[in-house]
Every structure is written in structure tokens, then in C-alpha cells.
């Protein structure tokens, strides 16, 4: 019975491993425990076997028009003895291409394949691997398998391929709307020889239920992770899931396969074990479980005696969440609740590297992870927490340590945007509980800066002396170790307007007057005059003017209000919307003419691109967003179009670059690194660090100071200290530069200043 019922395939982890005990003793009980999913006993120590790492590897990426051709080709590729074959369909590929974090890794793709097979080979030499990959390529062509085969031995190129494969699952879950690719039949395994027919039959079942599926997995061993797209928020969706699962279990049984080739039975697949193994073997499973665990304490309800699939659902037919009015546009996710529900619980936000999630990295507390906050919001919205929780102090405490870095927006494979959710939460919270004075002050930092500049240098003395510091601590709760930026008497606006007189002053970065380079086409740009550039750091604006004019461009200074970022961060969405409308009114005429808006401060300029279309929701906002660029981004756009000639000398400089979190989330770091490398004498390195920990006003607030500095100590501060003083630190964000100075004692300058140093 066991020999007849157990699948004769490479991958089978369903049920208990009774087939390992058909021969006479001695028995190796390890084989019984492995795969038992904690239902039999607790493992306290393990002795494992190690195998040598391969000397070298190479990849062949075979492109197909559809998933069926890819599945059919597997048996012919196995003849070439690859170390592995991975399969990905167009759902994974297209989401990877659209992903901010993964889009740059897609250079290995030719055309728009419906599916690819990633074939890996081990070897001892380049020649051996070249021979293996070329033979496969020739064989694929002779058999008309696929339309392209890309071979690669370069490690970086291979890493790009594996990055796409690794993040495939999360990207699939980033599908917007209630229907998601769900893992209720996603671990089937069959003989690779039969994979082509199996995939066709699987697809027929799914399409007969008026839906589709996403495919990826380990094709070389016949284990496919196929996820039908289903919504479980209505009964017909739950019924569809049950019907598909029932038919797929029949299909797997017919093909002599296993419902689980890798992930185990758990709750989802355990319910089918009596059907798959028969009542006699299922009874043996129950007896085995009872012998090891007579009291049923060890992970109950898994493998055997499993509850029905439609119990214990995160969402179900009785799930509901209110349609909460919002200031930002959540229509891409249906509504606010839909954006919260984008979190599928994978927990990638609990990583210890990257930008996401700085508060979790520093606290190691689930509550302060993206997943923890999303779960609390979902529970509050759906009524699982007491009424009024959405505007409660307790939920505010959970949201408070979110630094609004947007790291989750790009690094969470599901695209959870906790910063956006926090903005809306704070808006609702303030409406119910009032707006604290400190929030009002920080949100309106632009107005404060106007008066600070008019009264400079007296204003600087007032805020830096002991009395001023004490007042800022008592009234605004600013930590005593934080230094506010100094105000300047001559604002950037005053300096810029003075250039229109008979003897206009040059930028201190200009060398010998304006550059002679020309730009084909539009020769005018609008420089966004942000708050900090205008009232605190006009040298950044002067550097930007020098660079843009050296590139042959005429610079016009914007007459805009504050971008609204401080208001958004503090949840004052009405105030932010008013500023957005005003700025769009002022800049739309330029956008209509194709005159670019250039920004130097990432948090300001990227507000135009990210939040403005969501706040104002009209075509003018979209037009302004499309017409707005960071200065490095714009320079490289000209460079790539062959329109930039910048006279940069051979000044030698070592530059260490730290990117702003919003920059990393919205546009990446490639343009900044490329812009700095325009200077031929510059040696440039990117700091591999996450959030700096300052996050605007967050790090100034006394209750956040320790956490802010701890985040900086995770990677940024040590990376800077590890470099000699002859390395200059370049940072785009104003709060990031302040954090670098406070944490390391090193002065950081803006990218525009550092690059302008090289102007001839």
C-alpha cells in the first residue's frame, strides 16, 4: 500500500515519511522527524552534512513565448545535467521590470517573454562553462525551444538574475486589488518528464474557474509554485478556492505527484492527505502522531486532523473594512484598507540590511516593523480591535516610530507604503485629538525661516544660547544635543535677484564666468527654491546655478511656497494640499512648455513627483510631476541624450556618497553616482547603509533622539568613520547632512557643491 500510494518523484514532503522504513532495521529515525513539521517532537541539536561550493557557475536564460513552452522544454534541458532550472512567468517578470528596486536588474531579458527558464551550471573553469552553456544554446535552437538564450558567466549579471527570482513571490503579492495570487495549491510536484502536460492541465482548471495563475518554481525537480488569482473577501471567491484545490488534488494524484514538494502540508495541504494517501495510510499517520504526541500538544492541526481550508482565513466572506475618506489618492489599492491589506505577512521588513525598516532594525520589535503596523491597522479597521482604535493613543504609539523613510515602498516586495498610511493616520488622529504645538511649528518651518532669516544673526544667537535652548526643549521638546540650522541674512533669493543688476555676482563655484557648452533644444530650467536652500544653505543653490549655467542653461528661480513635505510628515494634509495647489498653479505654465523644474533637496522635489498627483488629483499635477527632476537626474538625462558638455577639470577628490531614503525609494542611486563620476578626477563610493535616522524633524524630537542615533550607528556612522578625513562625504538631504555631522563630527556637503568644485 505504501509503495503504491507514495509518489515516486524527487520532491515529496507531504505526510510522514513511512516509505523510508519499508526495509529491515536499523532505522534512521532522523528520516521520520525531518518533514514532520514539529508535530512529533522538538529537535534540540542537528548534525548536518556539508558539500563543497562550486568553483564557478554560469547561467543560461532561455526565453519562451509562454509558460507551456517553458514547461515542455525542461525534460530536454535536464539531459545537459544542469545544477538547477528555475522557472518564472511574465507575471514575475513584468512586476520586476516595474519595480524601483529590481528594474535595473532586468537587462538580461530580451523582448517580452511569457516565461523564462534560468538554467545554472557548475564548472571548474570558464572554458568548461562556456562549452556547457553553448551546447545548451545550440540544442535549444535545434529543438525550437524558446526564441532566445542568454548565456552569462559574469557574477554581477548572475546576481541580477537571482535577485529577480528571489523577490518573485513578494512581487506577485504586490498585485493591486482584492484578488491576489494565493498559495493554496502552490507547492505541487510532478515528474519533470510530465511537466509540460501537467502545466497545461493545471492552467485549464484555473481558466475554467474564470481566473489566471502566476508561475514560478524549481522546474528541474518538478516542483512548481503556481498561485491562482482569487479574492477571498466574498463567498464565491472562497468557493472558487475550494473548487480549484479539489480539482488540482485530483490532477496531482493522476500525474503521480505530490501536493507538497517543498513547503510541507501545514493547514493548507494537510486537509487533502486522506485523499492523497488513502484511509489506511492516513490511519497510520494518526497512530504515529498519537505514539509520539499522545496529548496532541505538538503543532496540532498540521498534516493530520487539519481544519477545513475555509476556516481561519485572514480574509473571508465575513471580512469587512470601512471605506475611510482620505486626502491622498488610494484608488490604485481601491481604498485605504486595500493599501493596508497589501501586507501579506511575509516579514521582509524584519531584515537587518537595506533601508526598510529602520525602526525595526533598531528595536527588533515586531510592533515597530512595517508588518506589525499593517497588522494593527488592519485589525483596527476590520473591528477586531475595540471601536475608536483608529484614532487611539495606543495606535499612535505603534505608528510613531515609523520614520516615513519609504523604504518599504521599494523594498517590500508587496509594495506596502507605510509612510503614506502614516500620513493619513496622523490626519485622522489630529482631527480627533487636536494638533500639538510642536507639529504646527515643524509643519510650518518655512514661515519660521522667513522670520529667522530677517532677524539673522540675532535669531541664531537666540536659538543657540542657553536660554533659547532651554525654551526649545521645554516648548518644542527638541533634544539638547541637536543644533538647529543657522539662518542667513542674504537668502538665496536675494543673491539670485542681485545677479539681475548691472554687476551681477557670479556663483563662487563658477570658474571664469559662464560655461560655453550648449544644450540642444530647451535652454531654460526652473530651479526649485526650497526652504533650506533659501534660508539656511544658499551655497547649494549657488552650486546648482553654476552647474546648470556651465551646461549652457538659463536658470529661472521658482516663486513657490514650501513644498508641503513638513506638513505631510506631521499629518496636516489640508495645509499640504493648499501649498500643492499653489505650487502647481505657479509651475504648470513651465510644464506646459516643457521647461524642467530642477530640485536639489530630495524630500522637496520628490514631493512634487509622489504626493502632488495624489493630493491634487488632476492632469496639471501629473504634468508638473513628470516635468520635475533632481539635479543629478537631470544632468544625467542630458548626458545620456548627448546634450551635455560640462567643463569639469581633473581635480582629484575622494567622495563617499550617502543617498536620501526618499531618493532610494523613488529613483535609486544610479544617477547620483554617475553625476559625481562626471568629474574625471573623482573616486566615488556609495555608502551601503540604510536610513540615517534623522528623518526630518524626527531625530530632533527628544523622545526619538536615542533611536535616531542608534539607527545611524547601524551602518552609516561606522562607514564614514572607517574612511580617512581625505574622503569628502556627499549627501543630498539636509537632515541627512545634519545627522552625519552630529554622529561623526564630519561635515557633509551637497552633491551639487561637491560636483561644482570640479568646474573649470
Language-model features and meaning:
Residues 6-21, 86-102, 150-167, 216-229, ...:
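A glycine-rich phosphate-binding loop feature that marks nucleotide/adenosyl-phosphate handling sites
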Residues 179, 254-259, 266-401, 420-421, ...:
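Ferredoxin-type iron-sulfur electron-transfer modules and their immediate structural context
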Residues 293, 300, 315, 419-503, ...:
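Iron-sulfur cluster-binding electron-transfer modules in prokaryotic oxidoreductases
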Amino acid at each position: 500500500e505504501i509503495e503504491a500510494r507514495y509518489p515516486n518523484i524527487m520532491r515529496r514532503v507531504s505526510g510522514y515519511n513511512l516509505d523510508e522504513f519499508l526495509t529491515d532495521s536499523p532505522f534512521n529515525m532522523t528520516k521520520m522527524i525531518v518533514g514532520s513539521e514539529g508535530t512529533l517532537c522538538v529537535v534540540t541539536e542537528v548534525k548536518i552534512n556539508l558539500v563543497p561550493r562550486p568553483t564557478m557557475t554560469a547561467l543560461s536564460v532561455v526565453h519562451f513565448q509562454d509558460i507551456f513552452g517553458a514547461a515542455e522544454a525542461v525534460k530536454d534541458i535536464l539531459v545537459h545535467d544542469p545544477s538547477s532550472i528555475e522557472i518564472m512567468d511574465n507575471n514575475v517578470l513584468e512586476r520586476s521590470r516595474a519595480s524601483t528596486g529590481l528594474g535595473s536588474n532586468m537587462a538580461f531579458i530580451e523582448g517580452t517573454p511569457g516565461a523564462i527558464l534560468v538554467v545554472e551550471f557548475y564548472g571548474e573553469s570558464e572554458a568548461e562553462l562556456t562549452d556547457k552553456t553553448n551546447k545548451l544554446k545550440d540544442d535549444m535552437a535545434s529543438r525550437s525551444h524558446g526564441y532566445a538564450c542568454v548565456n552569462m558567466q559574469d557574477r554581477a549579471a548572475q546576481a541580477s538574475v537571482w535577485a529577480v527570482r528571489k523577490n518573485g513571490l513578494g512581487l506577485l503579492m504586490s498585485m493591486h486589488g482584492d484578488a491576489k495570487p494565493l498559495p493554496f495549491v502552490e507547492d505541487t510536484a510532478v515528474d519533470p518528464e510530465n511537466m509540460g502536460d501537467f502545466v497545461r492541465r493545471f492552467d485549464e482548471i484555473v481558466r475554467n474557474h474564470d481566473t489566471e495563475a502566476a508561475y514560478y518554481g524549481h522546474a528541474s525537480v518538478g516542483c512548481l509554485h503556481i498561485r491562482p488569482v482569487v479574492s477571498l473577501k466574498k463567498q464565491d471567491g472562497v468557493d472558487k478556492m475550494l473548487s480549484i484545490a479539489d480539482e488540482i488534488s485530483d490532477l496531482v494524484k493522476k500525474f503521480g505527484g505530490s501536493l507538497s514538494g517543498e513547503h510541507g502540508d501545514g493547514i493548507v495541504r494537510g486537509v487533502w492527505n486522506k485523499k492523497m494517501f488513502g484511509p489506511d495510510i492516513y490511519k497510520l499517520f494518526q497512530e504515529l502522531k498519537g505514539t509520539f504526541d499522545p496529548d496532541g500538544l505538538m503543532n496540532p492541526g498540521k498534516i493530520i486532523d487539519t481544519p477545513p481550508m475555509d476556516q481561519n482565513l485572514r480574509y473571508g466572506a465575513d471580512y469587512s473594512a470601512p471605506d475611510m475618506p482620505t486626502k491622498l489618492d488610494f484608488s490604485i489599492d481601491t481604498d485605504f484598507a486595500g493599501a493596508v491589506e497589501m501586507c501579506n505577512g511575509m516579514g521582509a521588513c524584519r531584515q537587518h540590511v537595506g533601508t526598510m525598516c529602520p525602526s525595526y532594525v533598531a528595536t527588533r520589535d515586531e510592533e515597530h516593523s512595517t508588518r506589525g503596523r499593517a497588522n494593527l491597522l488592519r485589525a483596527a479597521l476590520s473591528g477586531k480591535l475595540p471601536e475608536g482604535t483608529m484614532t487611539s493613543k495606543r495606535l499612535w504609539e505603534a505608528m510613531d516610530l515609523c520614520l516615513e523613510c519609504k523604504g518599504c515602498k521599494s523594498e517590500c516586495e508587496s509594495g506596502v507604503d507605510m509612510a503614506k498610511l502614516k500620513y493619513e493616520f496622523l490626519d485622522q488622529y489630529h482631527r480627533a485629538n487636536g494638533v500639538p504645538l510642536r507639529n504646527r511649528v515643524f509643519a510650518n518651518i518655512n514661515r519660521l525661516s522667513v522670520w529667522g532669516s530677517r532677524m539673522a544673526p540675532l535669531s541664531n544667537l537666540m536659538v543657540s544660547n542657553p536660554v533659547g535652548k532651554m525654551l526649545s526643549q521645554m516648548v518644542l521638546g527638541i533634544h539638547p544635543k541637536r543644533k538647529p540650522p543657522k539662518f542667513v541674512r542674504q537668502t538665496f533669493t536675494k543673491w539670485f535677484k542681485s545677479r539681475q543688476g548691472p554687476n551681477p555676482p557670479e556663483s563662487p563655484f563658477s570658474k571664469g564666468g559662464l560655461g560655453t557648452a550648449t544644450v540642444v533644444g530647451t535652454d531654460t530650467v526652473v530651479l526649485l527654491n526650497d526652504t533650506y536652500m533659501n534660508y539656511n544653505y544658499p551655497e547649494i543653490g549657488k552650486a546648482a546655478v553654476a552647474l546648470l549655467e556651465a551646461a549652457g542653461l538659463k536658470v529661472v528661480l521658482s516663486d513657490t511656497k514650501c513644498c508641503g513635505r513638513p506638513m505631510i510628515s506631521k499629518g496636516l494634509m489640508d495645509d499640504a494640499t493648499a501649498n500643492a495647489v499653489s505650487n502647481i498653479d505657479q509651475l504648470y505654465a513651465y510644464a506646459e512648455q516643457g521647461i524642467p523644474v530642477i530640485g536639489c533637496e530630495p524630500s522637496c522635489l520628490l514631493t512634487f513627483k509622489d504626493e502632488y498627483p495624489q493630493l491634487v488629483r488632476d492632469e496639471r499635477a501629473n504634468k508638473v510631476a513628470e516635468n520635475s527632476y533632481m539635479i543629478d537626474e537631470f544632468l544625467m538625462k542630458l548626458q545620456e541624450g548627448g546634450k551635455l558638455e560640462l567643463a569639469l577639470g581633473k581635480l582629484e577628490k575622494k567622495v563617499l556618497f550617502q543617498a536620501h531614503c526618499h531618493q532610494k525609494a523613488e529613483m535609486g542611486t544610479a544617477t547620483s553616482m554617475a553625476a559625481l563620476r562626471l568629474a574625471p578626477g573623482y573616486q566615488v563610493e556609495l555608502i551601503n547603509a540604510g536610513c540615517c535616522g534623522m528623518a526630518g524633524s524626527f531625530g530632533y524630537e527628544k523622545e526619538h533622539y536615542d533611536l535616531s542615533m542608534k539607527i545611524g550607528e547601524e551602518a552609516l556612522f561606522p562607514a564614514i568613520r572607517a574612511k580617512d578625513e581625505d574622503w569628502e562625504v556627499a549627501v543630498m538631504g539636509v537632515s541627512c547632512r545634519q545627522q552625519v555631522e552630529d554622529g561623526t563630527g564630519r561635515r557633509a556637503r551637497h552633491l551639487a557643491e561637491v560636483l561644482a568644485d570640479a568646474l573649470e
